[in-house]
Amino acid sequence: MCIRDRFARDLLSIVDGRLVWESLVERVSSISGPVWLTFDVDGLDGSLVPATGTPVPGGLSHWGSVELIENLFASGNCEVVGADVNEIVPGTEGSLTEFSAALIATKIVACHIANSESKIGE
């Protein structure tokens, strides 16, 4: 599988954003083999992560990110062997960035635990 860039404007476009989003979710669901999941918080909307190297207006929403993570783990085609959440630049903006990153990390861990438990039950 190759790596592709996705632009927020393509995902959020009123005209065809939903189709592009569904295509992205489908691609994530079809990933197979061992996967290292790297989540750069600067891909989130800048209002969620003001303390990052490159805050992006119009980036991914929290719930969009959760949907992608859940679909990756639920696909059954891949095994997430590790993960990291990065691009956090602690500053004086408060703790919103760290909190947003912690929510994403918690979702990754929860999905990993749920996958591990479902494999034990098989």
Describe each model-derived feature in a short phrase.
Residues 1-5:
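Conserved small/polar residues in nucleotide/adenosyl-binding loops
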Residues 6-122:
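Catalytic cores of soluble, metal-dependent hydrolases
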